[in-house]
């Protein structure tokens, strides 16, 4: 959520909310490559207060590759450029490529897993990425987000 601007007289945009349940489906799991498809299941409240039937929507996908030799780096203005990392950058690292709903690239970065007794965690390099569709459709004052992804896996406690 925006709390301030960096130009005079800037007024933060009104926050919005969205709801849904997200499921992740394993598409492929081979030695050095994993592909995960995210699926959204949404319900909407109707004008009469009733709840709609579920709507299932293909959401984003993430592909993981071990010691990836090339990644797509977002450079702004809906443009990506191929980047070939140095061996030291990719050695022992997994890349995470995130794709939008239409399977076009969104962002990609390298990271390494840290394993502890109670969790495993992967932290990406800092990456540029385009605005999410939900923001790009209502915002025109910027077109790049800079982010770091952290994926943490913990034991399932039933």
Language-model segments: what does each one mean?
Residues 1-34:
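Short N-terminal edge-element motif at the start of the domain
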Residues 1, 35-158:
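Calycin-type beta-barrel ligand-binding domains and close structural analogs
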